[in-house]
Amino acid sequence: TVTVAGEGSYTIDPTTGAVTFTPEKDFVGTAKGVTVQATATITNANGKTATITSDATYTPTVVPAVPTTSPATSKDIQGATQTGTPTFAGTTVQVNGEDKAITIKDNSYTLLDKDGNEVSTTPAYAEDGTTPIGTFTIDPATGQVTFTPTDKSYTGKVTPVKVQAESSNGIKVDTTYTPEIVPVTPTATPAETKDIQGATQTGKPEFKGGTVEVNGVEKTVPINEDVPATFDDGST
């Protein structure tokens, strides 16, 4: 075996002389090649023998064949679960007049965590890249990524998560999915009362759920009537 750093490795079948080149995954272009030597023994009419050798080179060329990618984004209101599916597309390359199709391997979709490890779930961070605000999970069969917020008070962009897929020729490519959280603020109408000196008075401010337009659709977050009203210091 002969290994050329940055290119790949060569093996030879000593019986047939066939050379096999196994390229490194990122190598493209024409390799430096290797020298192949054959030895033969000849015998002349007098019965004397001699050994002769002959050298030849083998030079492989690797044609680029990388899938294409497109990132995904989504936008929704505070507290909503969001999904996005980045696009991974195969390609076709022509080699020696023959079309060769490159496809995406089944069930090869995965997330990459902050350290570049392949994972099926990973924390989601605020735009600062350090504050955890939720989780990302992925469907390995479809590549759909789900963002589930845990800090429902956070609004703004979420740090993009890397999404990876592998092609049929063993090339791993990645792109991103970026959710954005739109703030929704409930509205309040103050209450006023008037009565005589010493009389107990009762008033009830009116609260309505916040409404915002997201991607052309009006969305409302209703007031949770199961949560009791309190004063601004939390007391009742």
State what each model feature region is.
Residues 73-81, 192-201:
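Short, solvent-exposed loop/linker segments at the N-terminal edge
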Residues 18-30, 144-156:
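Extracellular/luminal low-complexity segments enriched in Ser/Thr/Pro
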